[in-house]
Structures are given as C-alpha cells and as structure tokens.
C-alpha cells in the first residue's frame, strides 16, 4: 500500500500508512501498526484496508478489530475499539477492555460491525436493542506451562457490563 513501512525480518505492511517493525509481523489494514514478534494488526481474512487503525505490540498478539489494541503476549482484540492486555486475553465486545490472564471470552455482545457501530447497545441517545455487552473483564484463567500461553481453563475474576452490572 501507499506510504507503508516494514522494517525487520519477514515483516509485511499492506494498506495505506501501515507500519510493521520487528520480526514476522503483519500490518494489514489502513494505518495499522505492529511491533515485536509474530503480531497481526488488521483483519487478514478481509480485503486490505479493513479494520484500520489497529495496533498489535508484543509477542503473538492480534488486533483485528477496527481501532483495536492488543499488547503483551498472545492477546486478541477482535472487536471494534477493543483492547486486550496481559497473557492470552481476548477482547471480543465493542469497546471492551480485557486484562489479566486467559479470560473467558464469548460473553456479552460479540457481534462485530467492522465499519459502523452496530455492535454497541446505545447509539444517538437511543437503545439499539443489542445486548449491553461486556465493558471490562479481568481474566484469572490458567497458564499452559509447556507453551507459556493460556491453558484449557479460562476464567474471569471480575466482569463489568455496559449496563452497570458487575460479576465477581
């Protein structure tokens, strides 16, 4: 793409204004950024330019949602404006923040609208009818000591939904 930068071993920057630094990273969408080792910013299953303004930093992180951010190790921010930090966390609701270790995903509203705001329950002062979804989660799942990634037992210590409900 135009104005892309790829510095390092086997890095790819595709999509206008994308930057890829480190080793074996992919910056797929428009204005996406990767740094570290084996990270992906953008939705590689879609055309170049989809899921723009995503950032993936660290080791084996994925930021595939539009304007999403993932960092640290083996984290995934897969919905729009979502953030995943820690070890093997997944942020799969609109605007969600997942921190900690190996959280349980698939809770709330995991519908993805890559270009608009269909995944959020409250727009233009009106409730849309969508599930309020998860705003914040702290994962406290196990770690697979042989891989250093999340194990087979994901778990959540704390969940806050957009409607204000909290679960311990």
Language model segments and positions:
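Periodic small-residue-enriched repeat registers in elongated scaffold domains
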Residues: 1-168
């Amino acid at each position: 793409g135009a104005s892309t930068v790829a510095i390092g071993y086997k890095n790819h920057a595709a999509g206008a204004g994308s930057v890829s630094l480190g080793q074996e990273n992919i910056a797929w969408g428009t204005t996406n950024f990767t740094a570290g080792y084996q990270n992906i910013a953008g939705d590689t299953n879609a055309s170049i330019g989809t899921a723009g303004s995503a950032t993936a930093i660290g080791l084996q992180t994925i930021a595939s949602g539009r304007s999403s951010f993932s960092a640290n190790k083996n984290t995934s921010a897969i919905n729009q404006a979502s953030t995943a930090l820690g070890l093997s966390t997944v942020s799969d609701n609109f605007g969600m923040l997942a921190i900690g270790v190996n959280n349980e995903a698939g809770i709330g509203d995991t519908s993805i609208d890559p270009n608009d705001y269909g995944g959020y329950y409250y727009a233009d002062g009106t409730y849309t009818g969508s599930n309020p979804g998860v705003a914040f989660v702290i994962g406290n799942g196990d770690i697979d000591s042989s891989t250093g990634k999340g194990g087979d037992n994901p778990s959540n210590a704390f969940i806050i939904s957009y409607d204000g409900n909290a679960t311990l």
